[in-house]
Every structure is written in C-alpha cells, then in structure tokens.
Amino acid sequence: MDTAKMMNRYTSFPDADLLDFVNAPLGKGLPITKPLKPLIAIPTTAGTGSETTGTAIFDLVTAKAKTGVAHRALKPTLGLCDPLNTRSMPAAVHAASGLDVLCHSLESWTAIPFNERVPRPSNPILRPAYQGANPISDIFSLQALRSTIKYLPRAVKDPEDHEAQSQMLLAATLAGIGFGNAGVHLCHGMSYPISGQNPGYFHAGYNEADPLIPHGVSVAVTAPAVFKFTAPSNPERHLAAAECFGVDISSVKKESAGEVLGEALADFLVKLGDQPRGLRALGFRPEHINMLVEGTLPQRRVLNLAPGLAIGGGDVERIQVTKLFEDAMEY
C-alpha cells in the first residue's frame, strides 16, 4: 500500500526529484500541492493501517534508515478491509504486524498533545500530517490498544481463530486512524535505523533469503525502554495504558508509571513468543549504538512528537537517544 501511495505521488508529479517530498532533513519536505489520483487500498496484514493514513514509508538505503512522505493528500480514496484477506498470514506475520498496531496505539496515545506540538505553521498546507495526541485520536488509539492486547495472542496461537483475526484487522484500522491523526514517536523513530542497519538477523517464521527484521519487531523491541522514558511527561496516560494490559494501578504511584508500563510490555512480548528480548538478540552490540543514533536523529517527523525528548537535535537529545538504545539492549 505504501508503494502504491508513493507511485501515485510520483506519477502525479513526474518532474519531481525522488527526495522532493520526503520528510526533512533527509529530503526537502515539500508539500503536495494538488490532489492525487484515486487509490483503493486493500490490507492483507493486520498491522500498518496504511489504508487510513497519509504516510508512505520506504527504505532509504543511502541513509541506512527508513523514511517516508507524510501528507494528507496521500490518504487512499477508499480502504477495503476484509478479514478474509488476512487468513493466510503465518503466525509470525500475525505477531510482527500486530506489534506494529500495539505501538501505533501506544505511541499516538502518549504523543505530545496537539496544543503543545511544534512547529505550527500558520499556512495550513505546510502543517504536518501528524497533529499530536487529541480527543479524537485518543478514542481510536485506546480502543486499538485494548483490542490488540486481547486478540493478538489469540491470533498468533490459533490460525483458525477467525474472530481474533477479524478483530486485529479492525484494530489495525482503528490504530491507523488514531496515529494517522496524532502521530507516532520514539519507537518508530528508533526502528528505522534498526531495520536499515540489520547486523544479520533472521526472524523466526520468516522464510527470507536475506536478513530481515520485520517492522513490527523493530518497533516493539525498544518499547519497554521507550515508555519508561516518556512516562514522566504524562504518568496518568501511561498508567491508563498499563491498565489495558491488566495491571491494577489503584495503588501505583505516578513516579512508577514508566516502570509499570515497561514491565507490562515486556511481559506481553515474552508471552507472545518468538520475540527478541532487546537489541542484543537482534545482533546489535554497544559499538553499533552511535550509528543507530545517527539514523534516528534525522527522523524529525516523529521525534518532534516524543514527550520528554529535548527536541532540536542538540547534545542533550543525542545523549537521551543514546541512553534509550543502551536501555533497549535487553529487557
């Protein structure tokens, strides 16, 4: 679906350079100034929610990281979400794509609020596709989180559990509406160089000839560390997320919100099965961290929505991102 969006954009602007519309600073970040061709998106996995969003992600090999184009004009004209199209997914693909849903919902739920987001250009055409957490996106993000926690383990465990498969496709779409409006932040920003700098990892259940870290895996592997870091910005939201995992938060102190949510996430990932327990399990070592940081810092489209991050690409932000990768080595 993302490839179709990119082709729609490039065929509508045949004289444009590859990087003209790609998110700055990796590209020029130019706005899309006219309607694109009609596009019907049909998901065959329960993960990206791309049928609902104005985002198209691709691997920019020269930068050793993923990036993309984000603009409302990229949103498909129509999305056809039929659970029958997901029935042939292997368990490993159910798991990896479902973890993308999990992080879409968690990141959009915890993103910087819409009224605190910067920059906020006065010209509407220059405004980013992602607006920050808001009352509308919250509805979709929280429901997608609850559904993923309930149905993803079932969909992975039993290929004949059609109810779970159907609910996961719905959750992916709901999360797409949520994060397509509010945005994602650190898990996704850090995942792009993780995927692009794969040291040789082959994921269980994927019959690939070349090393591959599935996108959902690259996103979820840092999640326990990420939400421990972001929790002080809004402990109440992080505790509400922990409650979705079944945690009794009635006596949890606000300052413990990150630890509680991080532990709930780690427990969920372990019980899901066949998930790498940190970057070390993917083959990364401490000597790789500097390059991972270099691949993360240009991801301004999402980092600008990260609560608690010293936004701006300076030394403090670099130290924070470095520490996050260090903390994500194992959980």
Residue ranges with predicted function:
Residues 11-129, 233, 240:
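A glycine/threonine-rich phosphate-anchoring loop and its flanking beta-alpha core
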Residues 71-73, 94, 140-143, 233, ...:
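A generic short alpha-helical patch detector that favors 3-5-residue windows
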Residues 7, 28, 288-289:
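N-terminal loops that bind phosphate or other acidic moieties
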Residues 114-264:
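Active-site segments that bind and position negatively charged phosphate/pyrophosphate groups
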